[in-house]
Each structure stands twice: as C-alpha cells, then as structure tokens.
C-alpha cells in the first residue's frame, strides 16, 4: 500500500498543473480525481479531462509502493495551505488517503484505481525535438488570435505545421491572423495538425516553468493525437481538432504603399491609454498618420473623447517614421493591436499599409523578430 514522503512545494507545483487540466465541473467522479502512483523513488501524478492526459513524475521518498486516486481539487486545496515542509502520504485500508504535515492530519476518501483511465497510445507519423523556449515563443505569439466561435471549430486552436525545415504556428479568428515559426535542425516530413486552445494553454504553462524553459521538448504527431514529452518527467497527450485549417497565405498582403515604423513600447502605451475611453460594444481607435506626426484618438459613447500625438523622431527610445507624403486615417480595434504589441518583445514595430482607403488588411512585422508576422483587419471610424 502506498506510503511516501514528499516536499510540500514540489507537490504543490505538480498539483497546480494537474488541477489546471481537470475540468472544474466534471460530472464523472473518476475524471475529477488524480491518480498517485509511488514506485522506484518517484511519485507519478496522472490527471485527465479525456481530451488531455497529463503525467508528471517527481522525486519522493517511497516507503511503500502503491497507487490510489483522490480528489484533485481537495488534495490541491489542502497542500497549498500547508507550510513548506515534508508531507507523509499513506494509503489506509478503508479507501482513504492520510496526509500528515506539521501538527495536522487529513483523511481523504479515495476511489478505485481500476476506474481511472489509462493514457492512450500514439503511433507518431512525425517526431522531433525543439527547445522549450522556442516552443513557448511560437505559442505565445499565436494563442491570442484563436477563434472563440464554436461554429468555426477548425479555427478553435493553433495550426501547428511543418514545411521543409520550418515549424509553424498559426491562428486566426477571421479578423486577425498570427504566424510564428522556428527553423528545425533537420528537414522532416511535412505535416499539419490543429492543437485545441485548452491544450495550447496547458503545454505553454509547462514549457515556461523554470525547471523546463532551458530544456528540450519532444513533439510526436499523428493524425488525431499529439504528445509532448518535456524534461523526460512530464508527458502531455492531447486530442486534436478534426478539421482543415484554411490556407492563410492568401490573406497575407504581398505589397504596400506606405509603412509606419515606431517604438513598440511608446505605441503600445499610447494605444492602451486612448482605448480607456472606448466602450465594449464598439471598440475602435483612429490612427491619423503623416510624415510629421501620428495622432491616436478615440470617441467613447457616454464617456467622451481622447487623443495623443506622437511626433517624428529618429531617437531609439521614441522612434517614429512614416514614409509617405500622403496622409492616412485608419481605424483598429485597440485590443487587436495591444495583443500583437504585447506578444513580441521588440524595440521597433512596422505596419505596412496596402490601401490608402484604409479598408485593406494591415501587415505587422518586427525587425528584431523576423519569424513573427501578423495581419489585422481595420475597422471603420
């Protein structure tokens, strides 16, 4: 029967990842539980919502091997409130788990291990390794433009695809398009899958963790599943969205008549300030561009109006340059611009305008991050 000693802070972190995977309102009791398996000096924590399956191994002192399942939320709530010290977990012979800490004791009800699902197998058609940092970069650069419209299920995730030696991530909600990619060390089979939003969020948390960010992640792809192996001790298996992602290359503007280059932080801060005046029903800001100035303005129903002026400058910290003699007035949803400007940490940002009528999509690039590009549709103002 299971008995082990574990560091509280180590268990807290792993339970945090597990709890995030488990659905809060799970009607099937077994899926609201976490399976704890103690063996060979490790504690394996398994959690699932049937679309995602997470397995984590942490080093513990195993006094007696065994496995049980217990409520993920209850165990997590208890352990998070305990001081940083050692905990002793002991399986009792009456379907209970005993948790002993400093001057405290809890007995939790358990469910049979036989009722907990096993992780599905995967027959990968493609597998490769990249750094966790690179993977985090392409997910963070695309996750914000995933469509939330469930009737367009093929847009409810990130399109991960391989073309020659490039590994791409792309997402769109019909109003904006985000593309980010990295170069692989060797050429592998072209392949494409749609990773659900929930799965993207969970694997991003894992790869950004301090113990993983400087390690590699192995990615295994099949037609209906994707498997991530991170730092050898963490495995995430996810179902994929069964659909076809649109050929987004047709939506990327091929030419432009003018270009704005501006300090990213100054641009982002100004947009954020002016956007305060806008209302949720119709969020729009107006950019009035000329060689000398950029005016950012907005009118908010029942709120008032606001404007801010940025003047032309070649100084690195306040750079602004618009390369066309003819002025341009164009409107955007400020949230769309803010999302892009927060996703890529670059000193400068470039906006390419292909239509003086301000109705054509706008291409956004970052000189210091050439493998991230974005397209945003303007709005009427």
Swiss-Prot record:
Spell out the disulfide connections. none
Identify the domain of life.
Bacteria
Sorted alphabetically, the keyword list is:
Cytoplasm, DNA replication, DNA-binding, DNA-directed DNA polymerase, Nucleotidyltransferase, Transferase
Lineage runs: Bacteria, Pseudomonadati, Pseudomonadota, Alphaproteobacteria, Rickettsiales
Assembly state and interactors? Forms a ring-shaped head-to-tail homodimer around DNA which binds and tethers DNA polymerases and other proteins to the DNA. The DNA replisome complex has a single clamp-loading complex (3 tau and 1 each of delta, delta', psi and chi subunits) which binds 3 Pol III cores (1 core on the leading strand and 2 on the lagging strand) each with a beta sliding clamp dimer. Additional proteins in the replisome are other copies of gamma, psi and chi, Ssb, DNA helicase and RNA primase.
The protein's GO terms of the molecular function aspect are: 3'-5' exonuclease activity; DNA binding; DNA-directed DNA polymerase activity
Q: Where is it mainly found? A: cytoplasm
Instruction: Give a GO cellular-component term.
Output: DNA polymerase III complex
The protein depicted here goes by the name: Beta sliding clamp
């Amino acid at each position: 029967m299971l008995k082990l000693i574990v560091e509280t802070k180590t268990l807290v972190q792993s339970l945090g990842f597990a709890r995030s995977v488990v659905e809060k309102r799970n009607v099937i009791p077994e899926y609201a539980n976490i399976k704890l398996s103690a063996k060979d000096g490790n504690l394996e924590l398994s959690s699932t919502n049937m679309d995602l399956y997470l397995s984590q191994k942490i080093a513990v002192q195993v006094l007696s091997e065994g496995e049980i399942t217990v409520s993920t939320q209850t165990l997590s709530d208890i352990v998070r409130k305990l001081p940083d010290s050692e905990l002793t977990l002991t399986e009792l012979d009456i379907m209970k788990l005993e948790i002993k800490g400093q001057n405290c004791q809890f007995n939790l009800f358990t469910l049979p291990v036989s009722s907990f699902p096993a992780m599905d197998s995967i027959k990968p058609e493609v597998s490769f390794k990249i750094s966790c940092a690179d993977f985090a970069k392409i997910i963070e650069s695309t996750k914000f433009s995933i469509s939330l419209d469930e009737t367009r299920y093929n847009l409810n995730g990130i399109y991960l695809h391989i073309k020659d030696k490039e590994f791409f991530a792309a997402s769109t909600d019909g109003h904006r398009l985000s593309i980010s990619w990295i170069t692989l060390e060797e050429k592998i089979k072209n392949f494409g899958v749609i990773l659900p939003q929930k799965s993207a969020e969970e694997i991003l948390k894992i790869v950004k963790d301090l113990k993983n960010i400087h390690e590699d992640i192995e990615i295994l792809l099949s037609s209906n599943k994707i498997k991530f192996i991170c730092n050898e001790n963490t495995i995430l298996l996810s179902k994929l969205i069964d659909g076809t992602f649109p050929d987004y290359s047709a939506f990327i503007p091929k030419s432009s008549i003018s270009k704005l280059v501006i300090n990213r932080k100054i641009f982002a801060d100004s947009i954020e300030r002016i956007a305060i005046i806008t209302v949720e029903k119709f969020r729009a800001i107006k950019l009035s561009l000329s060689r000398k100035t950029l005016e950012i303005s907005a009118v908010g129903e029942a709120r008032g109006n606001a404007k801010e002026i940025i003047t032309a400058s070649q100084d690195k910290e306040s750079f602004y340059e618009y390369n066309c003699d003819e002025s341009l007035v164009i409107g955007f949803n400020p949230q769309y611009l803010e999302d892009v400007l927060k996703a890529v940490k670059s000193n400068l940002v470039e906006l390419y305008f292909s239509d003086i009528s301000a109705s054509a999509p706008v291409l956004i690039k970052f000189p210091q991050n050439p493998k991230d590009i974005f397209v945003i549709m303007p709005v009427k103002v």
